[in-house]
Amino acid sequence: MLLKADFHIHTREDPHDFIRYTAVELLEEAARQGFDVVALTCHNKRIHSEELSRKAEELGILLIPGVEAAIQGKHTLLLDMPYARLKVRTFDHVRALKRDGGLVIAPHPFFPAPKCLNGKLRENLDLFDAIEFSHFYTQTLDFNRKAVEYARKMELPLVGTSDCHRLWQLGTTYTIVDAAAKTIPAVFAAIRAGRVRVVTAPLRPFDRLRHGLKERRNRLRVRSEGLLGSALRFPSGAFPSIAQARIHSARGAERRLTRSEDAFR
């Protein structure tokens, strides 16, 4: 079965970012957009609960417990792993934790920010089941390109995510998973087997402006409250221009993606 999924989403319960909508409001919007699978991945906090799971089930959504953890200072998505019960701080901790299952995704791995994986992805490649294709790119500025090339080279699947911090971001980029069933094990098995495709389109200039304003508000809040900021800062400069994203499956087959695949919305 084909499942519309997003594996990287933040909500108001996130301790590191100023977000207006709650987890319940996010689930309601995801249901409105026709999502089948959602992972809530707040920074260093696993917010999954029986109440949220029941709400998701009522809405027809498979809810995957998750967290965007700072592992040796690098953002790493841990899905369906008991992060809250253990002090997971190093990649060796993640290796030990993964023996009991779960899925590990490299989020925005080559973006120009200290908290992005970059070289740590290469050093710990055995840990990662998939690489993220982030919603944050335009036709002239695209930090996903290196991730696409690296995923193809390493024969790892790409999963599209919104990294949602504002509701308008949900649905900008997502994944279609061809799973045997609508269960966490079946979804994870499909990802590992490369039975996924990314649905995406570059942000419009106005969307990028909104994104920048959001990051500025986050930084102001961080300074006023003395918190450790998690905003990504993107330097100005010339980057190769692309007119359309080219996404590669785990087997290296090139796939052009357009909004025509939005039939799943």
Model-predicted segments: where are they?
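Short beta-strand/turn micro-motifs composed of small residues
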Residues: 41, 108, 162
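Divalent metal-dependent hydrolysis catalytic cores, especially in the metallo-beta-lactamase
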Residues: 6, 27-44, 102-105
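Aromatic-lined carbohydrate-recognition surfaces of secreted/lumenal glycan-active proteins
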Residues: 105-113
